[in-house]
Every structure is written in C-alpha cells, then in structure tokens.
C-alpha cells in the first residue's frame, strides 16, 4: 500500500506540519507528499491521480481538518482500490472525527496499524459532504465564522460570534424541503441539518443518533421560534438534547432519508462540511459505503 500525504499549502499552516514530518521519519514506509495550491486543489489532485493509476492500491491521507477531509473524500468517490485516512495535524476543526471517539487521529503509527471501514457520503448536486450539510441559521453561522477564522480568530470563538450574528439576520428562512418525496409543510424554518456525522460548528451535536455507515441521512428541521425560546434551548442543541428536550417540543421535525430536495425562490447558502455554496435548488442523496476509510487504532489509556 502506497500512502500520499496531502497537506495544506497555506504559509500559516507550515509550522503545524513539523510534527507530521517528525513522525514520518520515525515510521518509515512508502509515501509521497502533496502540497495543495488552493481551495479545491486536493479534490482535483486526488481525482487526476486515481484516473492515471486505476489499479494502484493507494491511501490518501488528509492532513488537517474538515476542509481537507472533505476535499480528499470528494476526490476518491467512485474509484476502486483507493482509501483515505485522516491525520488531524494542521487543521482548525475536525467535527467529522467526533464519529470515532477514542481513535488516535494525530498519530502516524496508529494510522498505519489501523483498519478500514466503508462509510457513506452525501452528494449535493455535483458536490459532496462527508459530515454535515446545513442551511438557514446554521449556514449563516458558518459563513460568518469562516470569515473570522480566515482573519485569525480561534474556531470556537468564531463560531460563537457567528451564532450571535445569525440571531440578528437569519432566524426566518423561506426554504422548501422535501424528504423522500414528501414536503415538510412549514413556510419558514430556523435551520435544517442533513447529517452523516454527529457534530457541526466545533461543538453542536446536531445529529446525536447519526451513523455514517447506515445508508441514511439524518434530517433535523427546526421551525421558527421566538428569540427567547431559542436562547433557552441553545445549550440543549449544543449537547445534542434537542430531539428530546421539552422546549423543542413541536419545533423539531426529525426524519431519516435517502433523498432530500431543498429549494427556494431566492438564492440561499448551503454549507457542506464548512464550505459555503450559494444556490436555489439542491438535489441531495446518500451514497452508501462510497468511501473506504482507514481508522487509526484506539488511544492507549495512560496508567
């Protein structure tokens, strides 16, 4: 098995990869390094490599957080004999890794000694989401937080500021949602998450029951509610208790689905693993077990 480590080419990320290079020296194995040249380049590189080497067994290692994880996963969809792995080195957030508590995603040796699992991915028009796609209040939070993070604000602080901004600007969203052909009949929504993973925004457990290998999208639709009610329930949403919390009663619509259609007369943003995509019509479906993911060994307990 050949390994290709894909690292972010941004200058501010370079110091964070010293740990990776040291681990590679300590764990000799056949590998190449690829440094991305910009947003979307990891997906392009992986697809081109797979096209040129259709029969080669290779594992693409996404070195970073949710952004590069999404790009590598998007690149290997549809190719045989290709795996991906994740090293959370050099990234800002890694919500997708919350699906695997106890796994050591910072250790090269643990990755090399790991096992593979086939996981689902969500297709959104011609793009993909391996963790969570969301719109309404959530995508406004993400767009504002992304802007702050790019200016050096810590992710947790950025997302909390994003929440404050969205409270003022994005609590009433006229977006139509159809789940497996059935329309959710409410004129306005607060937010909606379509989840393969369990967490979004660094701390919000939007889909506590999600399993990323069951062939289903977890649909959580929150109806419009008063500002006071939303503020009172924010902590429950953060903890993943919104599906059972009394203050969310009659405000949450929860479904499991294979296909979802989202549309509006106006342009709106949908967020795919942190990437913001504008549009007015999104056809969304689950691709079961489309990705072969190498999982690292479980962290050793300290005596």
How should each PLM-predicted stretch be described?
Residues 179-181, 186, 211, 221-303:
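ATP/nucleoside-binding phosphotransfer catalytic cores, i.e., glycine-rich phosphate-binding loops
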Residues 117-121, 172-174, 189, 207, ...:
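Short, acidic/polar N-cap/turn motifs at the starts of alpha helices
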Residues 122, 141, 192, 219, ...:
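A residue-level signal for conserved active-site and pocket-lining positions in enzyme catalytic cores
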Residues 10-11, 91, 196-199, 224:
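Short, glycine/serine-rich, charged loops/turns that create anion-binding
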Residues 125, 129-216:
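ATP/pyrophosphate-binding catalytic subdomain of soluble kinases
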Residues 2-153:
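Small-residue-rich beta-alpha loop regions that form the catalytic core of phosphotransfer
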Residues 5, 33, 177, 219-221:
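Generic preference for hydrophobic
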Residues 54-55, 113-116, 168-170, 185, ...:
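Short solvent-exposed loop/turn micro-motifs enriched in small/polar/acidic residues
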